[in-house]
Amino acid sequence: MDMTSLWGRLAKLQSFFQDGLNVDENSHLPEADLRKISLGNLYVYQQQGVLNTFETGVTPSVRKVILGEYFGITDRDSAIETLNWLSQAPSQTMFHYAYTAFLQGGGNISRKWLNENEELKEHTDFRNDCLEKLETMEEKYPDIEQAGIVVSKEEMGKLGVLAWDAGRLNFISRLCLEQEYIVKEECMQCINAAYEMTKEVYTNWKDYAY
């Protein structure tokens, strides 16, 4: 099913759910554009925004809280700085260390590898974040494998967490545009960058969503 027909069906289904999916029946974005904006739609959905339009539909008050309190974005300069940071896929960097530790065998052996890593010794906050990610990885990997998302630890390493970084970059750049911190061209650069992050890694929406 192509994306255009998918959103059409979602619009019809919406009427059956009081708090269902929020789609605009009058929106007719090309499928290529829908693919790109959909990368940020988990976050749009969480804020009860519109899923099939370029505009997120997030209310101004909520938008201000997300940008200001969660991401420290209060003006153009902070918006550019944060979007540049998000475009570097920071979660993927953390995943690299946590995943490498995970491959050491798990448990205390993996934690020892992170704690003794020379590259992390002067970055204790980042190292602690990596330790948390390692714990989550050890807890969730059996479920990921059982669900058929990956068939091995090596395949999980290839998938990484680029979906998380790409989704945030997509969503936050659109909020910044709506808050008038950036212009449309800059927003599109972020959206395209997010799409490029994922298209070579995820071959289907199931892999991306997980």
Task: Walk through the language-model features, giving the residues of each.
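Polar/charged low-complexity regulatory segments
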Residues: 2-188, 193-210
